[in-house]
Amino acid sequence: MSRIGKKPIPVPEKVAVTLDGLLVTVKGPKGELTRTLPEGVTIDQTDGLIIVSADSEKRKSRERHGLSRTLVANMIEGVNNGYSKQLEIVGVGSRAQVKGKTLVVSAGYSHPVEVIPPEGITFKVENNTNVLVSGIDKELVGNEAAKIRAIRPPEPYKGKGIKYLGERILRKAGKSGKK
Protein backbone atom coordinates (compact mmCIF):
# COMPACT_ATOMS: atom_id res chain seq x y z
CA MET A 1 0.00 0.00 0.00
CA SER A 2 1.25 3.47 -0.89
CA ARG A 3 2.28 5.53 2.11
CA ILE A 4 1.17 8.74 0.41
CA GLY A 5 -1.95 7.17 -1.09
CA LYS A 6 -3.42 6.04 2.23
CA LYS A 7 -3.51 9.59 3.68
CA PRO A 8 -6.98 11.18 3.43
CA ILE A 9 -7.23 14.56 1.65
CA PRO A 10 -8.97 17.30 3.68
CA VAL A 11 -11.31 19.47 1.58
CA PRO A 12 -11.45 23.17 2.62
CA GLU A 13 -14.89 24.76 3.04
CA LYS A 14 -14.41 27.06 0.02
CA VAL A 15 -13.77 24.08 -2.29
CA ALA A 16 -16.41 21.80 -3.86
CA VAL A 17 -15.39 18.38 -5.18
CA THR A 18 -17.60 16.41 -7.59
CA LEU A 19 -16.88 12.74 -8.27
CA ASP A 20 -18.24 10.87 -11.31
CA GLY A 21 -16.48 7.51 -11.46
CA LEU A 22 -12.85 8.36 -12.24
CA LEU A 23 -13.69 11.93 -13.36
CA VAL A 24 -12.90 14.45 -10.61
CA THR A 25 -14.06 18.08 -10.80
CA VAL A 26 -12.80 20.59 -8.23
CA LYS A 27 -14.28 24.11 -7.95
CA GLY A 28 -12.81 26.80 -5.74
CA PRO A 29 -12.30 30.55 -5.38
CA LYS A 30 -9.57 30.64 -8.07
CA GLY A 31 -11.32 28.50 -10.70
CA GLU A 32 -12.25 24.98 -11.72
CA LEU A 33 -10.15 21.93 -12.65
CA THR A 34 -11.27 18.60 -14.12
CA ARG A 35 -9.16 15.47 -14.46
CA THR A 36 -9.73 11.79 -15.22
CA LEU A 37 -7.82 9.57 -12.80
CA PRO A 38 -6.00 6.46 -14.06
CA GLU A 39 -7.62 3.00 -13.95
CA GLY A 40 -7.06 0.84 -10.89
CA VAL A 41 -8.10 3.30 -8.15
CA THR A 42 -11.35 4.09 -6.34
CA ILE A 43 -12.14 7.52 -4.95
CA ASP A 44 -14.69 8.24 -2.19
CA GLN A 45 -15.84 11.41 -0.44
CA THR A 46 -16.98 11.36 3.19
CA ASP A 47 -17.61 14.35 5.50
CA GLY A 48 -14.94 16.75 4.23
CA LEU A 49 -12.36 14.08 3.39
CA ILE A 50 -11.45 12.41 0.12
CA ILE A 51 -10.07 8.89 0.31
CA VAL A 52 -8.27 7.28 -2.63
CA SER A 53 -7.81 3.51 -2.51
CA ALA A 54 -6.25 0.93 -4.82
CA ASP A 55 -8.69 -1.53 -6.44
CA SER A 56 -6.38 -4.52 -6.01
CA GLU A 57 -2.91 -5.41 -4.86
CA LYS A 58 -1.63 -5.64 -8.43
CA ARG A 59 1.48 -3.63 -9.18
CA LYS A 60 -0.27 -1.21 -11.58
CA SER A 61 -2.97 -0.38 -9.02
CA ARG A 62 -0.45 0.22 -6.27
CA GLU A 63 1.66 2.44 -8.56
CA ARG A 64 -1.32 4.60 -9.43
CA HIS A 65 -2.64 4.82 -5.87
CA GLY A 66 -0.19 7.46 -4.61
CA LEU A 67 -0.19 9.27 -7.96
CA SER A 68 -3.98 9.65 -7.93
CA ARG A 69 -4.04 10.92 -4.36
CA THR A 70 -1.35 13.52 -5.14
CA LEU A 71 -3.12 14.65 -8.33
CA VAL A 72 -6.38 15.28 -6.44
CA ALA A 73 -4.55 17.03 -3.56
CA ASN A 74 -2.77 19.30 -6.08
CA MET A 75 -6.09 20.14 -7.76
CA ILE A 76 -7.61 21.14 -4.40
CA GLU A 77 -4.55 23.23 -3.46
CA GLY A 78 -4.56 24.88 -6.91
CA VAL A 79 -8.18 26.07 -6.91
CA ASN A 80 -7.81 27.23 -3.31
CA ASN A 81 -4.40 29.02 -3.35
CA GLY A 82 -2.92 28.63 -6.84
CA TYR A 83 0.66 27.83 -7.84
CA SER A 84 3.55 29.96 -9.02
CA LYS A 85 7.16 29.55 -10.18
CA GLN A 86 9.72 32.33 -10.30
CA LEU A 87 12.46 32.53 -12.90
CA GLU A 88 15.49 34.79 -12.90
CA ILE A 89 17.24 36.03 -16.04
CA VAL A 90 21.01 36.49 -15.60
CA GLY A 91 23.22 38.14 -18.19
CA VAL A 92 24.02 41.48 -19.78
CA GLY A 93 21.22 42.61 -22.11
CA SER A 94 18.97 39.68 -21.21
CA ARG A 95 15.51 40.75 -20.13
CA ALA A 96 11.81 39.94 -20.35
CA GLN A 97 8.64 41.95 -20.76
CA VAL A 98 4.93 41.25 -21.08
CA LYS A 99 3.08 42.49 -24.18
CA GLY A 100 -0.62 41.84 -23.69
CA LYS A 101 -0.58 38.27 -22.38
CA THR A 102 2.53 37.23 -24.32
CA LEU A 103 5.94 37.06 -22.66
CA VAL A 104 8.76 38.45 -24.81
CA VAL A 105 12.25 37.25 -23.77
CA SER A 106 15.48 38.80 -25.06
CA ALA A 107 18.08 36.18 -24.18
CA GLY A 108 21.05 36.87 -26.45
CA TYR A 109 19.60 35.57 -29.71
CA SER A 110 19.30 37.68 -32.86
CA HIS A 111 15.55 37.88 -32.25
CA PRO A 112 13.31 38.12 -29.17
CA VAL A 113 11.53 34.88 -28.23
CA GLU A 114 7.78 35.09 -27.66
CA VAL A 115 6.02 32.72 -25.25
CA ILE A 116 2.22 32.55 -25.57
CA PRO A 117 0.60 31.31 -22.35
CA PRO A 118 -1.97 28.49 -22.46
CA GLU A 119 -5.41 29.02 -20.93
CA GLY A 120 -5.16 29.58 -17.17
CA ILE A 121 -1.51 30.73 -17.04
CA THR A 122 -0.41 34.32 -16.41
CA PHE A 123 3.03 35.92 -16.66
CA LYS A 124 4.29 38.85 -14.56
CA VAL A 125 7.67 40.54 -14.95
CA GLU A 126 9.39 42.48 -12.17
CA ASN A 127 12.35 44.77 -12.96
CA ASN A 128 12.95 43.12 -16.39
CA THR A 129 14.79 40.11 -14.93
CA ASN A 130 12.31 38.25 -12.71
CA VAL A 131 9.45 36.33 -14.34
CA LEU A 132 6.53 34.96 -12.30
CA VAL A 133 4.51 32.14 -13.89
CA SER A 134 1.24 31.54 -12.04
CA GLY A 135 -1.97 29.54 -12.42
CA ILE A 136 -4.18 26.94 -10.74
CA ASP A 137 -2.84 23.81 -12.47
CA LYS A 138 0.49 22.75 -10.91
CA GLU A 139 1.50 20.64 -13.91
CA LEU A 140 0.80 23.45 -16.40
CA VAL A 141 2.68 26.06 -14.30
CA GLY A 142 5.73 23.77 -14.06
CA ASN A 143 5.68 22.97 -17.79
CA GLU A 144 5.47 26.64 -18.81
CA ALA A 145 8.29 27.58 -16.41
CA ALA A 146 10.41 24.76 -17.89
CA LYS A 147 9.69 25.98 -21.45
CA ILE A 148 10.84 29.50 -20.52
CA ARG A 149 13.98 28.13 -18.82
CA ALA A 150 14.72 26.03 -21.94
CA ILE A 151 14.99 29.21 -24.06
CA ARG A 152 18.45 29.82 -22.56
CA PRO A 153 19.39 27.35 -19.79
CA PRO A 154 22.09 28.58 -17.38
CA GLU A 155 25.61 27.78 -18.56
CA PRO A 156 28.16 26.42 -16.05
CA TYR A 157 31.03 28.88 -16.64
CA LYS A 158 29.51 32.26 -15.80
CA GLY A 159 26.00 31.22 -14.75
CA LYS A 160 24.29 33.29 -17.47
CA GLY A 161 20.88 32.24 -18.72
CA ILE A 162 17.38 31.70 -17.34
CA LYS A 163 17.19 29.82 -14.04
CA TYR A 164 14.63 29.15 -11.34
CA LEU A 165 14.82 31.56 -8.40
CA GLY A 166 17.11 29.98 -5.80
CA GLU A 167 18.49 27.35 -8.21
CA ARG A 168 22.19 26.65 -7.66
CA ILE A 169 24.27 26.30 -10.80
CA LEU A 170 27.29 24.01 -10.55
CA ARG A 171 30.15 26.14 -11.79
CA LYS A 172 33.10 24.83 -13.78
CA ALA A 173 36.61 26.22 -13.88
CA GLY A 174 37.63 27.77 -17.18
CA LYS A 175 40.59 26.64 -19.26
CA SER A 176 43.90 26.71 -17.46
CA GLY A 177 46.69 28.47 -19.37
CA LYS A 178 49.64 26.60 -20.88
CA LYS A 179 52.52 26.19 -18.43
UniProtKB/Swiss-Prot annotation:
PROSITE patterns: RIBOSOMAL_L6_1 (PS00525). The keyword Lipid biosynthesis does not apply. It comes from the Bacteria. It comes from Prochlorococcus marinus (strain SARG / CCMP1375 / SS120). This protein binds to the 23S rRNA, and is important in its secondary structure. It is located near the subunit interface in the base of the L7/L12 stalk, and near the tRNA binding site of the peptidyltransferase center. Belongs to the universal ribosomal protein uL6 family. Part of the 50S ribosomal subunit. This is Large ribosomal subunit protein uL6. PANTHER family: 60S/50S RIBOSOMAL PROTEIN L6/L9, LARGE RIBOSOMAL SUBUNIT PROTEIN UL6M. SUPFAM superfamilies: Ribosomal protein L6. GO terms for molecular function: rRNA binding; structural constituent of ribosome. GO terms for biological process: cytoplasmic translation. One of its GO terms (cellular component) is cytosolic large ribosomal subunit. Gene3D superfamilies: Ribosomal protein L6, alpha-beta domain.
